C-alpha cells in the first residue's frame, strides 16, 4: 500500500471516531438519558477544557520523549477504552468524568495525526502543501460516513454510537503503530510548553485589530459548539409537529450536508482569496454564520425543509472561510518569531475557550 493510501486510511479513521458521536451524542443524552441542557453542555465543554492544555502536553511528549506515531496510538487506545466504558454509563457525574478524560486523549490526536502525516510525506519526498490537503479531505469523508452509519442504523439515540466510535478508535490506535517512525526532535528543536500553547503570542492582544480578531474567534468557536451540541436534539423536538418527516427520522443525514458542504467549499478558497483577499473572505464568513443560524431558526422538517438544507450548505462557507482565512490572517500579522505560537493561540480561542463557552 502506498504511503498516501496509508495516510488516507489514518485520516479517515481519525475523524470517523469523532463523527460517530459528536453530532448525535447530545440527542442521546437528552432523549434517552434525560440529561438537562446544562448537563449536556458541560459534557461537550470538556473538549474545550482539554484543548486548552492537552495538545501542548502531548506535543511536548512526542517532541522530546517518544515517537509521535506511538503517542498517537496510545492516545487512541486509551480513548477507545473510555468510549466503550461510556457506552454503559447512564448517570451524569460518571459520564462527565469519562468524557473529560476521553477529550483529554482525543483532542491531542488531531495535531499528532498531522505531525505523523507531515513526517511520512517528507520521508517519501512528497510536497506537503500539495499532497496533504487531498489526504485531509478524507478525514471529513470519514466524519460524514460515521454520521450516516449511525443514522441509517438508527443509533442516534442509542449507546451503540459509542461502541462504533470505541471500536474504530481501537483499530486506529493499533494501526498508528504501523506508521512511519517520527522520533523525538533534538532538544534545540523542541518547543517549550509556553510556545506550544501560544502563551508567548499574547503580546498580539496589544494590537486592537488582533484583539478583536481573537475575541471574535472565540465567539465563532462557541457558535460552532452550539451547532454540534444541540443540532440533533433541536430537530428531534419537531417529532410531534412533523412525525415521519426526513429531518426528524434522519437528523444525522440532514446535518451531514454541513460536512459535505465543508468539503466542497474548501476547494473554492484559493479562488476567493485571490479574488477578494483575506479580510473580505472573513467578512463573507461572518455574514454566512448569520444566515446559517437564521435559516436554521426559521426552518422546520416540514414545509421549511429547504431552509434547513440551505442552512447546512451555508455552513460550509461559514466554517471554511473563517478557519482558513483566519489562520492565514494570523500568519500574515504575527511576527515570524511567534507565528507558531500565534497559531496555537488561535486554536485556544476557537477550540478551547470558544468550545468551552459554547458548551
Question: Which residue stretches match the model-derived regions?
Answer:
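Hydrophobic core of transmembrane alpha-helices in multi-pass small-molecule transporters
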Residues: 12, 82, 92-110, 218-219, ...
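C-terminal transmembrane helical hairpin of 12-TM major facilitator-type secondary transporters
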Residues: 280-326
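Symmetry-related core transmembrane helices of the 12-TM Major Facilitator Superfamily/SLC fold
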Residues: 161-178
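Helix-loop boundary and gating motifs at the non-cytosolic
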Residues: 1-48, 209-251, 323
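Cytoplasmic membrane-interface "Motif A"-like loop-to-helix N-cap segments
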Residues: 63-76, 274-286
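C-terminal ends and interior cores of transmembrane alpha-helices
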Residues: 77-91, 288-301
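Central cavity-lining transmembrane alpha-helices of secondary-active solute carriers
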Residues: 42-60, 253-269
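Juxtamembrane intracellular "pre-TM" segments in multi-pass secondary transporters
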Residues: 1, 179-215, 240-242
